[in-house]
Amino acid sequence: MTEIIDGDAVAAQLRADLTGAVETLETAGVTPRLATVLMNDKQASETYVSMKQQDCEEVGIAAEDVRIDPEASADTLFDTVAELNAREDVHGILVQDPTPDHVPDERVLSAVDPAKDVDGFHPENVGKLVGGTPRFKPCTPHGVQKLLAHQGVDPDGAEVVVVGRSNIVGKPLANLLAQKAAGGNATVTICHSHTDDLAAHTRRADVVVAACGVPELIDGDMLSGDPVVIDVGINRVDADTEKGYELVGDVDYDSAEAAASAITPVPGGVGPMTRAMLLYNTLAAASEQTGVAVALP
């Protein structure tokens, strides 16, 4: 019988385990603080920021919400980030996507102090990750690693197919899983929109990670040998519901569940883990900046 990987439950346990690190910091006179900068008026971003704040409050991390008018200049955003960089009481900084079109994405990635870049996307931190000495593992890839570990899946020697090559999930996850380290040593194939015969790759995989942003692309016919299926996607599609839509992943859940040994649902799979790993990185950042050693799960 296929096992449903409950990301909500795993994330809840991780948050509980993180409270020890918070207590260690507090005992040393350090209140870990995460500042989130929001420069858009999208409801999805508002909801996500609110959920992050609730997570912070649950474990004892101070959450600071900084809002900037989407019509403001790009310099307004960068000046705000510079002020947060300079504050010793702020340990983690997150600029919530998306930012307005007039704000250069590459400049946003480079604006946050690498030591406070808890998303792990600053070029310096990307380089450290690729070099095998990550300061912060990007939240979603790290969350996927934690889910696999919770499931008892050791990537060492496994065939892993990552469908998607984004800088946020696909590429960093492939790098993490291939590294010569715990949670790595997998043989990783990255597939994407130009891959010929995608199913030929997914059918030979022990683990399939779907992170391509295409609703229900991966179905049961594309799986073989009872793989573990991790669905990173979350897509809003039209549906005959009260809201007029429903959320689906990049995996056709019903058919894939029948062909998999274990699978993550959408929602309630990877999403909660992404938020939990943001807390993890914030505590790691606070520890690094203050010199207070903490034990992280």
UniProtKB/Swiss-Prot annotation:
Organism field: Halobacterium salinarum (strain ATCC 700922 / JCM 11081 / NRC-1) (Halobacterium halobium)
Protein name according to UniProt: Bifunctional protein FolD
HAMAP family: THF_DHG_CYH
Keyword Oxidoreductase: yes
Similarity annotation: Belongs to the tetrahydrofolate dehydrogenase/cyclohydrolase family.
Pfam families linked to this entry: THF_DHG_CYH, THF_DHG_CYH_C
Gene Ontology MF: a single term: methylenetetrahydrofolate dehydrogenase (NADP+) activity
Function of the protein: Catalyzes the oxidation of 5,10-methylenetetrahydrofolate to 5,10-methenyltetrahydrofolate and then the hydrolysis of 5,10-methenyltetrahydrofolate to 10-formyltetrahydrofolate.
Binding-site positions, NADP(+): G164, R165, S166, S193, I234
Catalytic activity reported: (6R)-5,10-methylene-5,6,7,8-tetrahydrofolate + NADP(+) = (6R)-5,10-methenyltetrahydrofolate + NADPH; (6R)-5,10-methenyltetrahydrofolate + H2O = (6R)-10-formyltetrahydrofolate + H(+)
Subunit structure: Homodimer.
Enzyme Commission number: 1.5.1.5, 3.5.4.9
Tree of life domain: Archaea
Gene Ontology process terms (BP): L-histidine biosynthetic process; methionine biosynthetic process; purine nucleotide biosynthetic process; tetrahydrofolate interconversion
